Amino acid sequence: MIISKLLNQLIMKNLSEVTIFAQKLIVKKSVTPNDDGAVKLLKKKLSKIGFNNIDLPFGSKKNNDLILNLFSINKSKKLNNKTLCFAGHTDVVPEGDCKKWKYDPFLGKVSGGKLHGRGASDMKGAIAAWIMACDNILKKKKLNISLALLVTGDEEGVATNGTVKVVQYLKQKKIKIDHCIVGEPTNPNYIGEMIKVGRRGSLSFSIETIGKYGHVAYPHLAKNPVTSLIHICNKLNNLKLNLKAKNFPQTNLEVTSIDTGNPTSNVIPNSCKALINIRYNTRYNEKLLLKKIKASFSEVPCTVKLKIISSNKPFYTKSDKCLSLLEKSIYKVTKKKPTLSTTGGPSYARFI
């Protein structure tokens, strides 16, 4: 009943401590890849409550991609015990125009019963809640499981020096995570509404058509890459991606950008590029999708270049004892039965 007790401690008895610690985290201007002391703050608190910290920095200051990551564990003395881990990120997206915020985004202002600030829900508040819940329960009893925290500073960025490399390290050191809760905000309308148990895959790519410069008055001397790319995009839009997978939304393909870099209306450009993304269920994979994509290149006179920008596989967590316990715990605290969902964009849960 560990998860249930953690949630109860969090919501019913520990609110003020959670809020105070979350405020301390929000004050840190940790816009990716900057840390601004956020990990140091976590380490200090975790050490006090009996966790052992492992610093896992990846990248370099020289390349402006140094990411501070942390794996912290409170190891149970019981042999062959299981580990329950909470995965979170300390980095946040840029705050934009501060003048358009009601309160300073890095102040952590409490007003109207709400905590305001960049990262309050995504996800400094969640990290604070987990740590304070662990603190509360560890003061009261010895556990027969280990509690862990995996934190990255590279979730909102390109995600190359964050969770994916931490997981590689854990595998090398044979540190096993049996169950993991990722603290992303998953509730569209109210607390306890939804648990994300999987995500569709995501394939992002560019298609560039190479033609030949020319004046629009002499089209026979040119080769229009725009016409070729429009033909390809039309074919892609008409692809039948209708294979259904239980518990997953339908697969969809979206053209998100078409650009020539040509500001002139009377000149045929040399090249044209489109950016495209496919969100796909477990009935598809990258190899199958690429085969369909390349088939659309036929019948165009221009040279076609395909470049994969990013590729993430779909994943799904089947129902088990831990998931069932989590559902019951959420209902006990919120009186709401959570929906198990795979909607939305990819998260770094896929690495775990």
Give the predicted meaning of each segment:
Residues G108, D154, G214:
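Acyl-CoA/ACP chain-elongation machinery
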Residues K13, T186-Y190, V197, L203-F351:
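Metal-dependent amide/peptide-bond hydrolase catalytic core
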Residues M123-G198:
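Acidic/histidine-rich catalytic neighborhood of metal-dependent amide-processing enzymes
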Residues K24, I131-K139, H231-N238:
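Short glycine/serine- and small hydrophobic-enriched flexible loop segments
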Residues I2-G96, S271-L275, L289-K292:
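N-terminal helical capping/dimerization or prosegment-like subdomains
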Residues N81-A148, Q172-K173:
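Active-site metal-coordination/substrate-binding segment of hydrolases
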Residues G50-G59, L107-V110, T303-K307, V333-L340:
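Short secondary-structure junctions
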